[in-house]
Amino acid sequence: MKNKKALFIPLFIIILFIAFFNKIINFIINIKWFKEVNYLTIYFTKMRAIIILMIPIFIIFFISIWMYYKSLMINKNKSIVDIGLNKNDYGKKLFFIFNFIASIFLAYIFSSSYWYRILQFNNSVDFNVKDPIFFKDVSFYVFKLPLFESLYKVIISLLLFLVITTFIAYFILEAKYKIQSKKDINLKNINHGIKSFAGKQLAIVSGLIILFISFGHLIKIWNLVYSSNGVSFGASYTDVHATLLFYKIIVVITLISSIVTLLSIVKGKFKPVSICIGITIFLIVSQNIASFLVQNFIVKSNEKTLEQPYIKNNIDLTRKAFALDDIEIRDFDIKNDLQKQDITDNKASIDNIRINSFKPTLEFYNQVQIIRYYYTFNDIDIDRYNINGKYNQVFLAAREIDTDALNPNTWQNRHLIYTHGFGAVMNKVNSVTSEGQPDFVIKDIPPYNKTNIKLTNPRIYFGEKTNDYVIVNTKINEFDYPKEDSNKTNKYNGHAGIKMSFINRLLFSINKKDINFLLSKDIKKDSKIIINRNIVERAKKIAPFLTYDSDPYMVIYNGKIYWIIDAYTTTNRYPYSEPYDSINYIRNSAKVVIDSVDGDINFYITDKKDPIVNNYDKIFKGLFKEEKDAPKEIREHFRYPKDLFSIQSKVLGKYHVKDPGVFYNGEDLWEVSKDQKHVEGETNTNDAPYIIMKLPDQNKEEMVLLNYFNVMKKDNMIALFGARMDGEQYGKKILYKLPSDKTVYSPYLFKQKINQDTNISKELSLWNREGSQVQYGDTIILPIKNSLLYIEPLYLRASGKNSIPEMKRVILSYNDKLVLSPSIQEGIKEIFNSKDNKINDKNEKDSTKTIDDSKLKKAQEYYNKAIEAQKNGDWTKYGENINELGNILNSIK
């Protein structure tokens, strides 16, 4: 017997080890990885919190369950107990083991579920904003109330669990007693039996349940700030004058009832317990009836007047929660009286007008610049750079490896050879080639660079498409980039990765379920495995409590590619704030910067005023750095994020209104303007563009994120909403309100104006014939002084599977003028009837030259061949013909 007991503990440990084997392996690998990226303390924050919490929680659970068990065992009804668990010490030992395991399990579940809320509670940071009903700081609702709710649910659940298990225990023991004593089971005596077995215990539990019902209604009182019963979000007239009153009464009555219940137990009287429970149920039902009567017989007929103060609460706090309370609002009186000097003063804005559009440019990148089939451009980013002394807006993209496209897709190819992407592509947004294609300033492999931007190490080990692990410094050279008939190879010289010792090879073989880690002869002791290479997943692994932007963007700095991810702090617990997309508070409080070669990742706080990020900073010490610690050249590329701007625009459509009466009437609702991508296509919401522009009353150009607003369900534009992002202006928002008594063309109305112009529509119809299709680019509406300039690039796509759109014309509109032009500059000249002497002089000189007709015919021939090659996707032939065409054109200059 002793030998069996001696074997029990090691056997139990072995069973636990087998059951949690995979978790143990993951745990060891996580420790190694977090140590590699220098965030091991962040990983241990959670573990340390869980362990510290588990100890007192375990003691509370263990003692409570044991005391409850003992109280049942000293019952007067010995008939059950003697035959039950109290017959010998074996029952006590069995219950002790059960209680020990159950208490550990419950303590772990509780601690792992609520450690974060407890740490948030302990590290609460004030918002310095009070709710208008209970005058509590918002931090109470965001950091403290969630923990109270969790504790309430857990304790109520445990108390109900005790009641249920008590009944189950009674029935089991009663049945066992009846069977062993060969007596019939009499259901009529159940009530008496339960009272004898656990009457006092159940009465105590009932008293505690009533006590926590009181606490639950106190929580309901605080939760009225999230009520959706009124015309606006938050506590309404009915909530404050009826529901709140009843909740307060219920809190007091249930508190008294719990005391009465406990005193009744001492005196051995159970009738008061039933009365207290009945009163509680009556009050809860009465509250619902009273609220219904107040809403329908008092509020409904006087709603606008009675609800106004509560609507104002909703407006004020929603605007604060979505950072709309600091918008600079200006009237924009459209006069359309620009002079030639105004055009000259805004030349930099006009020169940076974007005529390249996202989708066709990405298509072109993936046709012309992937170089090999296994490369891909995941998306295109837009940013601003000082190129050769000029402030330019550019498109740029990183050339990543698409490992799923590898052929053959072997283990060595996927994990040892094709380890990284190579290079970047950049073009200015304001210019195209003579064929209407992006005009590259950085392109090809190795990079051909016409800029002053240094790119000396363009390798991409960490990116948006790097979803698999790689092993570097093996006996096999890594593929670097293709060069003519051979390939350039590379040895990784970064510091990312975990050394592949035999133990680590074994760990990863188990973790990845791949024997190749052990069998491969190419892996050396100095080899390193690089995991978690996807930049967003890498950030989430370290800081899962942040919300990340859907569009990370690349920056070229210090000769390398870096990634920037906008990180948000969000909550749905901000009082009175209307929820949008399941949140009712958001701040872009951090920027995440990741090195594409070394994988170094840094979290920079960019909004020190945000209490949530300050709460995180107190909990996860060492995670965040100050914004000033980021390199200046990186900070210059911080953008106002489009995801944040999108949700702010959605909220602003309703909450630009500050007057409760107007808000109640719903008479001034806005929506983001619609747009049309094809001549005869469907409409969709306009995508907010990043624009280089000089804001009215400003002295220099800057990058601004701009959205256009219409009146709800109308196409008349009513406002321009912009977010600034250059230097000290970062984060400042401005709203230009347009005249409501004039028709101001929205992007969609602008398209209708184009379609109704007889000359332009005729030209579009000719292009949009069988074999080709006209596509609209990204609509830009540029404010210049007190006027609006409309720009619409036109793309022509030839038929054919691999054809790509080419930018052929630009439509410009100003006031009542509408022109179709080969370029922005020519369109501006046509609209404003201005003349450029240099251009005219050059044209005059060129017109005196005699051009050989045979050269023109040859040029036409090469052009036709190039177009045919493009349709067929034969980019080699296409390039050859374009080069020949270029030679002819150069010869006739």
From Swiss-Prot:
Key words of the record: Cell membrane, Membrane, Transmembrane, Transmembrane helix
Record GO cellular component, one term: plasma membrane
Main location: membrane
Transmembrane segment boundaries: 9-29, 49-69, 94-114, 154-174, 202-222, 246-266, 273-293
Membrane topology: Multi-pass membrane protein
Superkingdom per UniProt: Bacteria
InterPro entries, sorted: UPF0182 (IPR005372)
Subcellular location: Cell membrane
Family to which this protein belongs: Belongs to the UPF0182 family.
Protein name per its UniProtKB record: UPF0182 protein CLJ_B0017
